[in-house]
Amino acid sequence: MALLAAATLNPTTHLSIRSRAGHNSENLWLRSAASSQKSKGRFCNLTVRAGTPSKPAEPIGPVFTKLKPWQIPKRDWFDKDFLFGASTSAYQIEGAWNEDGKGPSTWDHFCHTYPERISDRTNGDVAANSYHLYEEDVKALKDMGMKVYRFSISWSRILPNGTGKPNQKGIDYYNNLINSLIHHGIVPYVTIWHWDTPQALEDKYGGFLNRQIVNDYKHFAKVCFESFGDRVKNWFTFNEPHTYCCFSYGEGIHAPGRCSPGMDCAVPEGDSLREPYTAGHHILLAHAEAVELFKAHYNEHGDSKIGMAFDVMGYEPYQDSFLDDQARERSIDYNLGWFLEPVVRGDYPFSMRSLIGDRLPMFTKEEQEKLASSCDIMGLNYYTSRFSKHVDISSDFTPKLNTDDAYASSETKGSDGNDIGPITGTYWIYMYPKGLTDLLLIMKEKYGNPPIFITENGIADVDSDPTMTDPLDDWKRLDYLQRHISAVKDAIDQGADVRGHFTWGLIDNFEWSLGYSSRFGLVYIDKKDGNKRKLKKSAKWFAKFNSVPKALLKTTNTNNKPAVTASVSL
């Protein structure tokens, strides 16, 4: 229901609202930005007039009605095998950057060499100190009733030089973490690589720009399988390869910080139109080799699963037109299909092959066969959506970044000037739960309905948000998560095979180029009190949400659900 209302601001900023249609008053989350939002899902279009009705309207931004009690998700909406958990990554939380034999990663090097590239000039040297405080992280998971912890392995902690003999103290750390999780009834889901390549390999041959990385990654994966595979039964080979390639080799805002000459980045010695595709190609080849190794030697009982975690963004056409509908399809191809289609059918999307040309590497027939159907499970990391607007394909348009190759711009506002959803405090995240439902249905209808986990989903607290007066009262995060959990349920009800939802993140962490200025955690890290963990409002809600006895939850047989196939519906 679209609600058009007039409101009068009183001195306490309480909004007294009466709708033109005579609807009852609603509690609304308002943001201070001069735009309005047309009805999408549960959002409503509100025009606020301060003063008399005759005064010109001053729209103050997208708003949405507060969820009614019956709209707030309940644990019994999902079957007992559906998994709720939280995610982190090694560099962002562990600290201990040079302790117990760990070698430097590309992120250690990037933060130490180019501190000006981090918004608050911080680094992950200590981070949340999870290397020493991992038991506190496990306790927080237990207190919230979470059943899964998704974390990543630091390549340079267990292989300081990237290759060779493992560092036993690094192995011990992850063994201790895994054992503690299992002792407390929490299932480990392990990401083998989450952006922190050993600096030794970057120095030796250029990291993911060199095909040699494929064999070295395979060795790293083998060490992980051999060291932890007796207890870890769910693996993701790579996390967010799309974002990594674009930010690390296109824009150069993430380690190793490469971009084309003349652009503003740490290392303007690259090629922003080629290197992202080269690095991405080697990531896919490394994934295929690791999966082949895993299935041949480390899953003899057939009880383990392996896949990849993709960063995804939802898209709506900028306006109701054929050209923008096509732009949306290309945007999805470049954002999701770039890495998804090779692991489903063995090659890149047709639109990418057509528009990128010889800058996009080719797979051999053998490589295609290894890649096709190489994921038992898939992770989707979803935060926000955009409008997709067609850009004319002509000789007058010259791409500067690989992201220009889709000939579709990503817009936060539609053709009517309205934002796609309320901004959340984090400058790049506009809340749009429908985008998640739509993506899950795309996975169902176009990609064979694979088993999916929402491996990341959340928003950040930021100091600049005037509504954030108490770091533990993260009411925006709670509302965001409730709406997105509901969006997952909507997709499940329409047949999508979704197996779990993991919030990003478990704890406040080092947020890459944003440093510690964006805090994504369910758990607050008090840096003034020895990195003490404190549950936020959202964490306490999860504790209540997850408290429903398992015996009261329904059971759904997933044994006959379709596996990931090598076919794509076009």
From Swiss-Prot:
Compartmental location: Plastid, Chloroplast
UniProt KW keywords: Chloroplast, Disulfide bond, Glycosidase, Hydrolase, Plastid, Transit peptide
Summary of pH dependence: Optimum pH is 5.5.
Tissue: Expressed in young seedlings early after germination.
Enzyme active site: 240 (proton donor), 456 (nucleophile)
Pfam families in UniProt: Glyco_hydro_1
Main location: plastid
Transit peptide, residues from-to: 1-50
EC nos: 3.2.1.182, 3.2.1.21
Family per similarity comment: Belongs to the glycosyl hydrolase 1 family.
Role description: Acts in defense of young plant parts against pests via the production of hydroxamic acids from hydroxamic acid glucosides. Enzymatic activity is highly correlated with plant growth. The preferred substrate is DIMBOA-beta-D-glucoside.
Protein name: 4-hydroxy-7-methoxy-3-oxo-3,4-dihydro-2H-1,4-benzoxazin-2-yl glucoside beta-D-glucosidase 1c, chloroplastic
Source organism per UniProt: Triticum aestivum
Organismal lineage: Eukaryota, Viridiplantae, Streptophyta, Embryophyta, Tracheophyta
Gene from which the chain derives: GLU1C
